[in-house]
Amino acid sequence: QITMTRNELFLIKEMMPIWQKYADAFVFMDDCSTDGTGEWLEEHKDEFNIVSVLKTDAAGDATHKESNVRQALFDEAFKHSGNIICLDSDEYLDGYISKEQLEEALENNKDTLLYCPWIQYTGKNIVRVDGPWKNNFKDRISSYSVRPEFQKAEMHSEHLPHPGRHGVVNAPGLFIAHLQWLDKPTVAVKQYFWKVTDYVNHATYGHDVTPPSAYDESVANFDWEYIDFDFDLKIDPEIYSKQDLKESYKYKFIKENIKKYNIPNLNDWGMNIHGDV
């Protein structure tokens, strides 16, 4: 499994045992964490079979080309296996399929990218299903016989390069559990962080960026629809609400750059994130 992370040690500590359900070994890209992530991963290499902990050269504020970083992460893992899972720190795989069944499927379907349902948890057994979140599939598992190239992207890069063929796995067989929506204040800060990051990258570097309206569509002004889900969340649903948001690097980045670039309110959904700087 490969994972890029920054200042998410509180998640990684909980995720490592869960990730082992489907992954035998791990390669991490530590994007300039200041919360001890890199040190913790190094200290627990033997316990979790972490084969490499790479580090980004950039300052970590999304000013580097993300696809280049993901390529380096992928290449390190490809030295060890052609069967690769790529998950963010707030994601894990779950379902009825066993590790052995998944491995057999990958071995029998070389050079195939598997799209899995992206399940948006909002509580222990409640998931978000409004708009694009009702039927959403993501690229998190693939097999490779030769080294592929990522499509170039400054930000929001594909997680895995396309090997030429693809397939779809459906829940409850296998799915991606996504924790992003568990805590609404955390959601607002994360999405507003991307708005500010895009603003800075476009103003400073001329990058093509995602328009703010795309984040508004994702947040949907917090007017969400829910359904019950058969698989209980394997993480404490309050994990985000227990963190100090104002001490997060995303919140600090927002405040610093609003002042530095005189950024207008990009619509913070009335959550007073933009506020007084």
Predicted features, each with a name:
Residues I2, G38-C86:
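Active-site-proximal specificity loops/subdomain of glycosyltransferases
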Residues Q1-T3, W19, A25-M29, I176:
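Hydrophobic targeting segments
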Residues T63-F74, G82, Y92-V277:
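Catalytic-site signature of metal-activated, phosphate-bearing donor transferases
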Residues N7-Y22:
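Short, well-formed alpha-helical segments that are part of the catalytic scaffolds
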Residues D24-D35, V53-T56, S89:
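Short beta-strand/loop segment that forms part of the nucleotide-sugar
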Residues E14-I18, W40, E100-Q101:
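A short acidic, amphipathic alpha-helical/loop segment
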Residues L9, D35-G36:
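Acidic phosphotransfer microenvironment of two-component signaling modules
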